Amino acid sequence: MSIIEAIILGLVQGLTEFLPISSSGHLRIVAAFSGWPDPGAAFTAVSQIGTELAVLIYFRKDVGNILATWFRSLGNKELRRHIDARMGWYVIIGSIPIGVAGLLFEEQISAPFRDLRLTALTLIVFGVLLGMVDRYSRKHRELTDLNAQRGLIYGLFQMLALIPGVSRSGATVTGGMLMGFKREAAARYAFLLAMPAVFASGLYKLKDIGGNEYAGVGATIVGTLVAFAVGYAVIAWFMRFISTNSFMPFVYYRIALGILILALVSFGVLTPESGAEFEGSAASVTAAEATH
């Protein structure tokens, strides 16, 4: 992978990570349109560390309070009912489904889920679902209404993001609004919930950088730094946007992009596996999996 490719893919990662339009799906699509090999699971996972660092900095006060109160509550029963202490447990509980599913279905995620037709269909289907929930759900709950059961349901929706095109933020925000949470509350918890899974996935995939993956160490570092810088600006804008707007612009975009991809595949402009393989210098290897 060239530095220019890394910059472009880092830009795509940063622009799409926090929007409900699927960053992994867009990385897959951009590679197909550009004629590049699929950037691979390791690049996708590690570059997401950059965007999650942006979340960590943007929500640093929330994260600091949650960590401090949660640790103190381990030895202080009176603190265990505090919202920050409970939030720590809810994030842990909500992270279990995607961790288990990611390990159990790693092989299935590797190849079949990279098919452009599936990416297009998930963009459309989950876009329609997001639109319906956003328009018709009764959004009245705040984060103080979160409990262990709702935290687990959030986690089950996040698990769907293992399929490119679903969108981690889109799936979890949809699940949150379906349970009655307001847009800002649903998004805030979705971003906090993503941190353990994304950091764990990125660290787990670090070992694959520079091996048979298309992206080398230098390109991955560049892409991650670009994703961090762009991601911070996007999350700041996105939280302001949803305070006064609905998710419908993203819904229309998802549906339009999904239809476009299906049309291009149908007419033979793209193949379902476009950009899915990377010919290494020593041998041909299949570019692997999705994380977001």
Curated annotation (Swiss-Prot):
The chain crosses the membrane at residues 87-107, 113-133, 190-210, 219-239, 250-270. Keywords: Antibiotic resistance, Cell membrane, Cell shape, Cell wall biogenesis/degradation, Hydrolase, Membrane, Peptidoglycan synthesis, Transmembrane, Transmembrane helix. GO terms for molecular function: undecaprenyl-diphosphatase activity. Coiled coil: none annotated. Pfam families: BacA (PF02673). It is found in: Cell membrane. GO terms for biological process: cell wall organization; peptidoglycan biosynthetic process; regulation of cell shape; response to antibiotic. It catalyses: di-trans,octa-cis-undecaprenyl diphosphate + H2O = di-trans,octa-cis-undecaprenyl phosphate + phosphate + H(+). It is a multi-pass membrane protein. One of its GO terms (cellular component) is plasma membrane. Its main location: membrane. It comes from the Bacteria. Its EC number is 3.6.1.27. It is an enzyme of class 3 (hydrolase). Catalyzes the dephosphorylation of undecaprenyl diphosphate (UPP). Confers resistance to bacitracin. HAMAP family: Undec_diphosphatase. Belongs to the UppP family. Bacitracin is thought to be involved in the inhibition of peptidoglycan synthesis by sequestering undecaprenyl diphosphate, thereby reducing the pool of lipid carrier available. This is Undecaprenyl-diphosphatase. The gene is uppP.
